[in-house]
Amino acid sequence: KQRVELTPGIDVDAILNDVKQRFAGEQVTDIDGVKIDFADRWVHLRRSNTEPIIRVYAEAHTQAEADALGRELIDIIKASHA
């Protein structure tokens, strides 16, 4: 579990939509955030209702792979609202 700190007032829905479009070739679910299912791993992005953050949950075969997947999505999120 990781998180991305956001600037207050940022359009979180636009960020999540950007991520959703970027991974349109994968199985994407947009219930309670955005979940992207890859063949052997998944990542779930969920906005906080109490803080200006997006929580990033990832699962893969190893903790290192899950951490790397989480960092990849964090980099994408940061780039989309830079």
Label for each model-derived stretch:
Residues K1-A82:
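Phosphate-binding and adjacent anionic-ligand microenvironments
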